[in-house]
Structure formats: structure tokens, C-alpha cells
Amino acid sequence: LDADGKDLNASPNGSFYLLYSRLGIDVQGPKVGSAKTSLKLEADFRGSGSNWAVLRIRHAYVNLDWGKSALLLGQTWHPLFGNVSPQILNLSVGAPFQPFSRAPQIRYRYTEKNFQLTGAAVWQSQYLSQGPAGKSQEYIKKSCIPEIYIGADYKNGGLLAGVGIEMLSLKPRTEATGENNKKFQVDERITLFPMKLTLNIPIKTGSSEQKVFWVPISHRLPVWADSE
């Protein structure tokens, strides 16, 4: 509020962007042994940071499908981004703590009737960890350990339940500055274990069906840090 008690934010604004216009292609490839192959490429013009109107890769992967099991190599949604997410008109994600991220990964999935098991090794590309030097790939690159994810999901009709856990191990720095600006080599690591819980319950009300769900919860908490 200003000195007269008026809302300083009560000013309308409007815009029209083409940043999220998408170009993509889906290809069904030939069989490799007993596996069906498919490829997906998708891009928009969001760029990164403040560099707007620049081509950005959203999805770029190859998938090998053996029926019950499948192997994906490339960039797609982070495994912590679950199947339960609000439908919104805006571009902002409407779920708190939703890990809205696409990342390069090697992902294996096994499906048996209503159950699905997922394991993945994930790297960082567009969505980066925050550290002493700001957002950077260096923390996970110097760690030499990718993000490791395992999870299980159950689906029966509209009912969907899932749980997953990830290990993220980073090296925030390899040197420190002491007295008289002397530099010292340090060996520090911080390890975090984000978790995901999802639940989607369809409830019929009259002739319509309403979906009531517990939104995905993902929170990265440091479990331990080691330094020498």
C-alpha cells in the first residue's frame, strides 16, 4: 500500500508471447530384436533464464519397448514429476513442491498388470542445483554421481497411487579461501533424498466425475554432509 492506502499492485498488465509454441515429432521405428523402438523430439522457444525467444529442447529420447519392460535414453520428464498434477490454464505449475523438470536420463520401467516399477539415472541440464556459485552443473559434474531414482506406482482405472525416492549427491566446492586469501583444497559432499508420494482418487458426483487427489510431494532435505 502507498501513503494513501492504495494497492500499488492494483495495476493491470497484459502480454502476448509465442515462447511456448512447440515443434515436435514422434517416430515409430523398426524393431530391434524383440523391442519396438520409438523416438520423440520436441522443442519450444523459451530459451533459458532471461534469454527468451531462443530454441529450447524439451524432449529428445529413444525408447525401447519389450512389452512388460522398457528402456528410455535421452531427455524427458524427471521421474519425480508424477502422473498426478493439476490441470491449469496458466503456464505456471499449480502443485506445491512439484518438481517441474525435464532432464537427461537412462530410465528402465517394468510393468506387471496394475503395477509399475521405475529406476533411473538422471543428469542435470536445464534445471540446475543451487550452490555457492549460483545455479550450475558443476556441483553434480564434480560429484561424478548422477541422481538415482527408484519408484513404484499402482494404477487401477482412475485410481493412481505411487511412491518414489531419489538420491542426489553434490560437491558444492573443491577449494576454500582462508586467512590471508590462502586457498585450500577441500573435499565436501552433500547428499539429499527427495521423496514423492502421489494419490489420485476419482469420485463420481451425479453424472460427472471429479478427481480428488493428494498432490505430489517432493522436498529435498540434506541428510548428511562430509568434509575434510
Task: Identify the residue ranges that each predicted region occupies.
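Outer membrane beta-barrel
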Residues: 1-128, 142-149, 153-160, 200-204, ...
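Outer-membrane beta-barrel translocator domains and adjoining extracellular loop/strand segments
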Residues: 50-55, 83-91, 128-140, 144, ...
